[in-house]
Amino acid sequence: MRAENIQHQKNNCGKAWVAYMEKKVTIVIPNYNGKRFLDDCLSSLERQTSKDFETLVIDNASQDDSVSYIREHYPWVKIAVMRHNLGFSGGVNVGIGMCTTPYVLLLNNDTRSFPKMVEELIKTMESADDIFSVSCKMIQFHDHEKMDDAGDLYTCLGWAFQRGVGQPVGDYREPAEVFSACAGAAMYRRELFAKVGLFDELHFAYLEDLDLGYRAKIQGYRNVYCPTAKVYHVGSGTSGSKYNSFKVKLSARNSVYVNYKNMPLPQLILNAPALAAGYFVKWCFFMKIGFGKDYVDGLKEGISTRKKCKKVFFRGRDIRNYWQIQKELWENTITYIIELAKRKL
């Protein structure tokens, strides 16, 4: 195991151990130098109406005393300490591998959960067996009147976007199917990771949750949004600013990976003109704000290293799912344009 140290909550009797083993949910929180966020995140979990969960922090070799702080102030939290930074994908994969519960709830360290968050996610997950993931209603931490994310969508332009970002928090009150869950606050059905696969560690960070949701959809599983499971989210809590060289380059590279892995050749050819247009528009945008070279470098790296990715094996029985996904890519492009127009008004 890649964990250097694992702190387990101690149980004093067999009965307590049985109760511990019967939890429905493991909350996995990846952390890298996030000590400043931990009080909000962990104290909000103490106030959950459902106690049917255990909590595991995956610490990616933090240098800010996060581990000692958790041990001192939140002794009920299990900790797995990595020897080096595995990124989001590698870190949460370690966490998922340590879980034995039916459901895994991935939660960013820069979140503060509403009291019914866990309870509502469990209800939604138990409503249908074909649900792979359930996404929370994420609200901007610094502006409680605005949405941060209501599930993620993907377009034929090769752009992923946060559904509802910047819109009034009173919107998006209804459950809905989404392209993928935002893994910053989402519950997954653990047994399906064996079929769908884990997070792609080549991604390191960014678009890894979209790639996972895409793979689940290819196999006919659903990703849904639960408006009653709510969290406040700071955003860019680990990487820093909204745009930086690291984020721009990795996002560009990973967008190439997502398309190469998940689209069979005919679908890639069908979407090639839209993808080319999407990459060009993004390049123009990043040139304008000073990250044009980083974006191009990311695309080049993605193209040159794409064959390191494990391409989804095409199965004839999934043709209907591919067609449904293609329709969603077109529909989501229109949705993106509409939401962009709303934000500009």
Residue ranges and their predicted role:
Residues 43-52:
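Short, acidic, metal-binding catalytic loop of nucleotide-sugar glycosyltransferases
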Residues 44, 59-68, 84:
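A conserved acidic beta->alpha catalytic loop
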Residues 81-99, 109-111, 120:
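Glycine-rich, basic loop-to-helix element that forms the pyrophosphate-binding segment
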Residues 104:
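Short aromatic/hydrophobic "clamp" motif used to bind/position activated sugar donors
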Residues 111-155:
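Conserved donor NDP-sugar-binding/catalytic core segment of glycosyltransferases
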Residues 146-147, 159-161, 167-188, 205, ...:
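A recurrent flexible, glycine/aromatic-enriched loop bordering the glycosyltransferase active site
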Residues 179-230:
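A short, conserved alpha-helix in the catalytic core of glycosyltransferases
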Residues 268-345:
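Non-catalytic, C-terminal membrane-associated alpha-helical segments of glycosyltransferases
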